Amino acid sequence: MTEEKYLRHASRHREIYTNTKKVQQYRKLIIELLLSSHCRDCTTCQKNGMCALQSLAYKVGVHAVRFLNNKKEEKIDMSSPSIVRDPNKCILCGDCVRTCDEIQGLGVIDFAFRGSKMKVQPAFDKPLVETDCVGCGQCAVVCPTAAISIRTNVTDIWDAIEDPSIRVVAQIAPAVRVAVGDNFGIPKGENCFGKLVSALRIMGFDMVFDTSFGADLTVMEESKEFAARLASD
């Protein structure tokens, strides 16, 4: 059979149907197959309500998965102080691989093995803490299913706030005071520092600092040290 019989060349007045009953069935089957080898602990997942796979399942009408999950459960990597990697939630989209390599320039994680055994992992399946990972969190930002997520310390923070013997201080980085607004419908680029300070104080934080204030103190201290060295010479 020649190659031409498989091709559909573009032509005038050609109509392409992208949402027929058959196409809908194919989409539903693809999502079912993804879910069949996927962790289904949605209620306790950090991405619950924001998961791309969960949203697609609702959209295409997957109410039950007909296939059994025969995938071996992988160990969760919690070695990093900032990143948690759960291979059981990975759908092999490759977003984290491209982000780490092409944007961050580190290439800490990549695809390993082939076929049904394929997975995303650091070289030689090392724990993240033993790799060149800098904990930037960009892989977690692009991950659609919480296969890579930011390590949360919410419980520890609340325990510290409720302990009267502990003075709890928050420090806000310049990027955070602008980027945090995206999650609350605030126009992009708007400085939310005042809102952040108010919210943190209401929550129970004793003091809130801007990182730039610390930078000013550092410059002053280093200038003092530099002047002292010049005087001693």
Where do the PLM segments sit?
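Iron-sulfur-associated redox domains of electron-transfer enzymes in respiratory
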Residues: M1-H13, V23-R27, L35, I150-D233
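Fe-S ferredoxin-like electron-transfer domains
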Residues: T2-G135, V141, I148-S149, N153-A160, ...
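Hydrophobic transmembrane alpha-helix bundles
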Residues: D77-P87, T145, K188-G189, V208-G214
